[in-house]
Amino acid sequence: MGLGLLQIGLTLCIVIAITPVLGRYIARVFLEERTILDPLMNPIERSIYVISGVRPKDDMTGWQYIRAILYTNLFMGILVYSLIHYQRLLPWNPNGFGVPRWDIILHTVVSFVTNTDQQHYAGETTLSYFSQVAALGFLMFTSAATGLAVGIAFIRGLTGKKLGNFYIDLTRGITRILLPISVIGAIALVLLGVPQTLGGSLTITTLEGGTQYIARGPVASFEMIKMLGENGGGFFAANSAHPFENPNGATNFIETIAMIAIPAAMIYTYGVFAKNIKQAWLLFWMVFIVFVILVWVAATGELQGNPLVNGTLGIEKPNLEGKELRFGWAETALWAVMTTATMCGAVNGMHDALMPQGLFATLFNLFLQIIWGGQGTGTAYLFIYLILTVFLTGLMVGRTPEIFGRKIEKREIVLASLILLVHPIVVLIPSAIALAYPYSLSGITNPGFHGISQVVYEYASASSNNGSGLEGLTDNSLWWNLSTSLSILVGRYVPIIAMLLLADSMSRKQTVPQTPGTLKTDSLLFTTVTAGIVLILGVLTFFPVLALGPIAEAFKLASGS
């Protein structure tokens, strides 16, 4: 127990230490201040702009920024769909894989282009190395950079600056942040035992005299951007539970830090943009405290173990079902909460085997989307709640709501409400449909309360662009591929459109001079109220689902049945 808690504590301390360093660096990149990579990257970026016809000094309006995102994402999706469809004709296919079904290709492309990386296939038996690295690997960089660009544009708008240029933000996000860190991280993973090869599967003879095929590939480079970009899609079906993706405690530590580094740093980046580091730290600690509570809930459940198993065996042991023993209960619980908090979606153990407390924590993260949140977009979601808090507190004291010196009016509240309503709509309605019809019900492997959790988790993971799943669900079917693709698209692009329109609206407003009655958003009291509103809205929206799923399952286990 002590060692497990020490591992969790050490990881969280490192997160706190690197947040201001990386947050300040990200701010310098997007404020176009000098960085250590300027001599190397400036010529490369200028060449990219010249070839693509981008004018770096041209700022975009909200709708221009939105159109740029939609057009580039559509183009990249069509390109990658074609590459996977024709993978049998392309190089780096030593295992001779053919063409997957059209619906699995569609779901995969939609999933990866949106930074969701929900996988209904096994990578080692479905996709060639070219499809994995050149196609999906390409989307891992661009989808992460797209989310990062949205977060930065949103921060710019709230702080009264122009939104910027999407193509510039996309390029700088890749060249200055994602690519350099991924290269360093991939080298570290190779040194620690993660394979990086274009050789085909190995054929070996087992001790019993049988034949076994061992899949391998260019895993290290794929793995690092998977974690750093909050992508989460694994090279292998077992994801980071596979010994080739995550062979030991050292690689697990690197991947855990990579997973949370940018979402945590983005809060500090806001503080630099707004010239209000105090508020950034208050928001950081608000999110951090809720995160630690959820880690404690999940870790306690795993440490106490399954009461039915322990009662039958007459021992008190942690829950080790679905765990890799090289990580144990503590690192698995921390990872499960972190991967759903950051919308990464990678797993180092099976979430389907989590105790109800752990399942509650992971679902809670997927429902709120702000406990760190996704790449860039998580920070934007956090400020949506901040805007609603200002609006509600303004109503209570009879003042016109203001934030960052700008009035919050009907348009902003309508857009903020739309952003928060999209997620429950594309989670709860498809879940109800899936639970009502025999065709979709056939994919559910657990008829009890856990079966409800399997369905809701699948759509919550899709809509929040997380991508993890309770893998007891048989999800590689036409229904699940198409329905989750729709949830992914709506859950990704409708909030992004509304966020950018809201930011554009705020950037155009005149600054209102501060008065003694102006609500200060950088106070402990206001931050506490924000946390309360976040939790209340989350509980009111999704508590019935939590009650029917993990809470009911916990009571059933406690009763001994």
Curated annotation (Swiss-Prot):
KW Ubl conjugation (keyword) present: no
Cellular localization per UniProt: Cell membrane
InterPro entries named among the record's database cross-references: KdpA
TM stretches of this protein: 2-22, 65-85, 135-155, 177-197, 253-273, 280-300, 327-347, 353-373, 378-398, 413-433, 482-502, 531-551
Molecular-function GO terms, alphabetical: P-type potassium transmembrane transporter activity; potassium ion binding
Membrane topology designation: Multi-pass membrane protein
Family matches, as Pfam families: KdpA
Family of the protein in this entry: Belongs to the KdpA family.
Assembly: The system is composed of three essential subunits: KdpA, KdpB and KdpC.
Cited function: Part of the high-affinity ATP-driven potassium transport (or Kdp) system, which catalyzes the hydrolysis of ATP coupled with the electrogenic transport of potassium into the cytoplasm. This subunit binds the extracellular potassium ions and delivers the ions to the membrane domain of KdpB through an intramembrane tunnel.
Protein name as catalogued: Potassium-transporting ATPase potassium-binding subunit
Organism: Anabaena sp. (strain L31)
